């Protein structure tokens, strides 16, 4: 039996900008990990004929679809069918993704050109910094965590 085509996948391109930290690692774990990613196969049948981990498989599939929808609503990614690049969605792509069941139409839009200014549905226009404005807090947290872990008992 022929293998079904892969689910829509995401391929990253950073361009010096940090991926939105609210979803970056979740997307990485859900979409790129070989066991949970876009190439994940359905579970094999157990010797008794029942699916060994059907519940887990359905949960992963549902969570992955929710991650796609959240990322598209945030304007971080576009869904591509057979490979491509991780880009901000063009105006028509949000509607196409919504028609495919990955998000609400019109929630991810592009505003402006030139300096790559774009607008979140819930926030101000962003520029090429793309989320790096608040990176100092994460540096402080990481530094304190390292101090805590390296302290002698």
Swiss-Prot record:
The chain crosses the membrane at residues 133-151. The keyword Signal applies. It is a single-pass type I membrane protein. Residues 152-153 are cytoplasmic. The keyword Transmembrane helix applies. It is found in: Nucleus membrane; Mitochondrion membrane; Cytoplasm. GO terms for cellular component: mitochondrial membrane; nuclear membrane. Residues 41-132 are extracellular. Ubiquitous. Highly expressed in testis. It comes from the Eukaryota. Keywords: Cytoplasm, Membrane, Mitochondrion, Nucleus, Signal, Transmembrane, Transmembrane helix. It comes from Homo sapiens (Human). This is Taurine up-regulated 1 protein. Residues 1-40 form the signal peptide.
